[in-house]
Design a protein with these regions (language model features):
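Conserved acidic residues
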Residues: 88, 136, 166
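Phosphate/pyrophosphate-binding loops at sites that engage ATP/ADP/AMP, CoA/4′-phosphopantetheine
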Residues: 76-88, 155-161
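Short, glycine/charge-rich flexible loops or terminal/linker lids adjacent to PRPP-binding catalytic cores
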Residues: 101-139, 147-153
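Short glycine-rich phosphate-binding loop at a beta-alpha junction
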Residues: 85-94, 169
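Active-site-facing substrate-recognition patch
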Residues: 16-84
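Short, positively charged and aromatic/hydrophobic N-terminal segments
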Residues: 3, 12-15
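PRPP-dependent phosphoribosyltransferase catalytic core
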Residues: 17-31, 156-231
Length: 231
């Protein structure tokens, strides 16, 4: 049985589907089970941006677990059908969402492309790999949302190619305020399978963290840039 908790809903940072709590908790539990998400309050991780964080997420590990991979694919398909309706194309953000995006597109019977962070410096100098036609409606698939900047870079590339980006779906979001602001500024709707709140709830329930860690984890999300200055 899955215990359902109440969390704040926001159109930019979580799905509005009726079963979003159940999906969020199952997904969070799965990520913890396969160590796709690591929590270490005492020895924080350093992101590429320089931000120190008590959490590190590597959703690419899900590709090595067929049952979890299948679950994510099925939930993405449900989410896209329910939230966006008919679309012409699925786009994955390179590199983390290429595989899961292609699986989702296959299940939906839709064409697939992936979007690089920037144009190649050689060959055809493509940023979008695959066939894109102006006027196509697109849903973007991403594995992880931190500030959202790299994800929205893919959205802009598709818009520049003449596509109508209906929105984005992702496996996990940290729920940072920067992400919400960036998605609002870009007029891009985001729906995720799970989020930071679900993750912390499951981590506490399954003894991945202690009650004493909670306050620090909450403070990190409130001020991720300042949180690790004394660590």
């Amino acid at each position: 049985m899955v215990t359902v908790f109440s969390f704040k809903k926001t159109v930019y940072l979580c799905s509005m589907r009726n079963n979003f709590e159940e999906t969020g908790l199952i997904t969070a539990e799965s990520l913890l089970q396969i160590k796709a998400i690591k929590l270490d309050n005492a020895n924080p991780f350093t992101w590429a941006s320089g931000i120190k964080s008590p959490i590190y997420c590597d959703n690419r590990r899900t590709l090595s677990y067929p049952k979890i991979r299948t679950y994510l694919r099925q939930e993405f398909v449900k989410m896209i059908n329910e939230e966006f309706g008919t679309v012409d194309l699925i786009a994955g953000v390179a590199t983390g969402a290429i595989a899961i995006g292609a699986l989702v597109a296959q299940d939906l019977g839709l064409p697939f492309v992936y979007v690089r962070s920037e144009k190649k410096s050689h060959g055809l100098e493509n940023q979008i790999e695959g066939v894109v036609e102006s006027g196509q409606s697109v849903v973007v698939v991403e594995d992880l949302i931190s500030t959202g900047k790299s994800s929205l870079n893919a959205v802009q590339a598709l818009r520049d190619a003449g596509c109508n980006v209906k929105g984005m779906v992702a496996i996990f979001t940290y729920g940072l305020s920067d992400a919400e602001e960036n998605f609002k500024a870009a007029s891009c709707t985001l729906h995720t399978l799970t989020n930071y709140d679900f993750l912390i709830k499951k981590a506490l329930e399954q003894n991945h963290i202690k009650d004493s860690d909670m306050q620090s984890l909450i403070k990190w999300r409130e001020n991720p840039k300042g949180w690790g200055q004394d660590k």
